Amino acid sequence: MKAAPTRSGGGALVASAILLVLAGEAARAEAPLHPGDSSTFTVMFENDLFGDSDAQYTNGIQIGWMSPDLDRFEQAHQLPPWMTGLSTHLPFIDVPGSQHNVGVALGQKMFTPDDTATRALVRDDRPYAGWLYGGLSFISKTTTRLDSIEIQAGMIGPASFAEDTQRLVHDLRGFDVPAGWDNQLENEPGLALIYEHRRRPWRSENVSGAGYDIITHAGGAVGNVFTYLNAGGEVRVGWNLPADFGTRLIRPGGDTNAPAAINDPRLDNRHRFGVHVFSAVTGRLVLRDIFLDGNTFEDSHSVHKEYLVGDLLFGVSVTFLNAKLSYAEAFRTREFDGQDRVHNFGSLTLSLTF
């Protein structure tokens, strides 16, 4: 038996923050910006309440900051030298003729089985699990290509505070709390190294007004949290397309929302409004997923994962003044043996360039 419908995460908080930010942006003077002068702050919120369910990947939130364009990573003076110094040891990202960015992120994800009413272990469904992490990314880009390497580190298990966060939010909103968190994965430090390459091979000749573009991506990750190879693409059609690298879900690989050229609507005073629809697809060959395979060094609940997993997104994005607001409906194929349906969740992203 399932519990009464419950909801995870801080949807009301995110909505309030979005309204406050947009109000503040509308009041700002329209001073011209440039990628070399402007940082980008991004808030992402994902929840299956948008898909009318409350299980599997049930909630995710991430906040991040991306530096202005830099000639060298060491110019990111907002970060300590030991962080930017890591770039000298990483491949693929110090491409001549490119601009560089450094980004930091903090996020949390929650996973639960379908049956959240029972305290007993649900052996044929995914484990309860949480993931609290920080990320440091290094990006090398032109207007048509982006290479990123991200280092993520954090905690799985009770130390992720996923149960505590869910209990707090559900208590505040009067929802039932899933009863089986005593069966969650054990505490385990997590570490992952992620590389992704994005390219814009096709776009319309118009850089303003009606237009389209296609953005492809490919990459992979290695670590005890997840190890995979991935590839996919995104199609965007609309008015005054942002000069960035598309809209993505909360997943590793660095932020793609920062403007990459001066003709981005968020930087160009002549075109401060834009709107577009988009569709994206991503496929992954999954070799390791701790949220399905269970703890690395401890005996824990696990299920037999699917090695091939895909995501399909449909969404709309609006740029106004210095803000970009995107919403996507995501459909994820079955991730393990016995999962009875495709998983549907919503993804809301607000990026602010300043």
Kindly give the residue locations of the regions a language model identified.
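Short loop/turn motifs that connect adjacent beta-strands in outer-membrane beta-barrel proteins
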Residues: E30-S38, D69-H100, K141-S148, P201-I214, ...
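Transmembrane beta-barrel strands of outer-membrane/channel proteins
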Residues: F41-N47, V102-M110, I151-G157, H197, ...
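Sequence/structural signature of outer-membrane beta-barrel proteins
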Residues: E46-F50, F111-D115, I156-S160, R200-S204, ...
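Residues that define the transmembrane beta-barrel architecture of outer-membrane proteins
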Residues: A55-I61, H100, Y128-L132, D147, ...
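Residue-level signature of outer-membrane beta-barrel architecture
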Residues: W65-S67, Q108, F138-S140, H197-P201, ...
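Long, hydrophobic/aromatic-enriched structural stretches that serve as scaffold segments
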Residues: L86-A162
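Outer membrane beta-barrel transmembrane domains
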Residues: D114-T116, E234, N240-F354
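Extracellular loop and loop/strand-boundary signature of outer-membrane beta-barrel proteins
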Residues: R119-R123, P178-N183, G219, E298-S302, ...
